[in-house]
Amino acid sequence: MKKGVIISCGIIILILFLSAGYYVWGLGRKSKNSNDVTFIISAGTSKKTIAKNLANAGLIRSEIALDVYLYFAKSNIQAGEYTLSASMTPKEMVNKFSTGDITIHSETITLIEGKRITDYASTLSEKLDFTKEEFLNTVNDEEFLNSLINSGEYSFLTSELLNTDIYYPLEGYLYPDTYEFLDNATPESVIKTMLDHTKLKLSEVTELISSSGLSIHQILTMASLVEKEANSDTDREKVAQVFFKRISDNMPLGSDVTTYYGVGKEMGDVLTINDLNDRNPYNTRLTDGTMNGKLPIGPICNVSISSIKAVLNKSNTNYTYFVANTCTGEVFFQEDYQEFLSKVTELQSLCATN
């Protein structure tokens, strides 16, 4: 009798010893192979299923050992995409799951000069984890704008942005460039990164800005018109000269690009008489005197440093008019109205025959 009890106890102890050994072995690294594997945990996945999936992926030695560990562990598993390898212990994997150490991807995004902030919102939302509407809502969020203005980080942002007649306060202030953004970047972080680039670019022309007699808002507004009207540096400087002269002469700028923006149409759309006469604070085609000698209320697109420099280094010419060949993009400049009308007629005839 005693002998049987001893044998039974011995067997139990042996089983416990072997089980403990198996458990410890099962929670060890499966291999020294450090090749990364993407492992996805969907919302609502059970711990038992996670152990099974890890075993099927060849990442752990024992599904049973991990199943037992997860059963007693108080870890709160978070859904997401994780980067794992067989060289990790199951405990290290579970620690990743419980801390939410998910894999963050990044996206390379190019934002082009001359595009509107609504275009930027579309491009960004296609690649990042926020919607176009969320980005535009952030751009228009007065509390966020005030935090930027008062932060001391962006001295070029002033209360001029808070004019409620401006469609999008940060239009013209987000520098066009190629950026690397994390997938989970917020609209706020993206905007701040772009403003950092704007600050860097403006630092190249600090002295010219100081001596210009213009506010940053005026410079960027004028630069946005130049950006849309000209392609070459030489033409940009001449276009800037024309606009400054028209302001000095108390004339309307008469720029179609401002009308397109003011009525929410894209370049190339047909502008109607109603569009040309629309009384919005961007429309420099108004001829009733309300826009004489005035810039639009704010920028109509986001601008390159080339257009900013053109505004600060306008040419020494004395042109009052310009017209572009819509077929070739070439811009022609004139000093008087009759010369301008003749060139318009000539170009219309040329484009009609091509």
Which stretches of residues belong to each language-model region?
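Hydrophobic alpha-helical segments
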Residues: 5-7, 18, 48, 237, ...
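Short N-terminal secondary-structure initiator segments
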Residues: 12-19, 34-48, 115, 148-149, ...
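Signal peptide-directed extracytoplasmic domains
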Residues: 26-198
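N-terminal type II signal-anchor transmembrane helix
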Residues: 2-36
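Bacterial extracytoplasmic/cell-wall-associated proteins, especially those involved in peptidoglycan
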Residues: 118, 122, 126-129, 144-354
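A broad, low-specificity signal for short, low-complexity segments enriched in glycine/proline
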Residues: 2, 41-46, 280-283, 292
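Generic cytosolic/nucleocytoplasmic N-terminal low-complexity/intrinsically disordered segments
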Residues: 1-2, 342
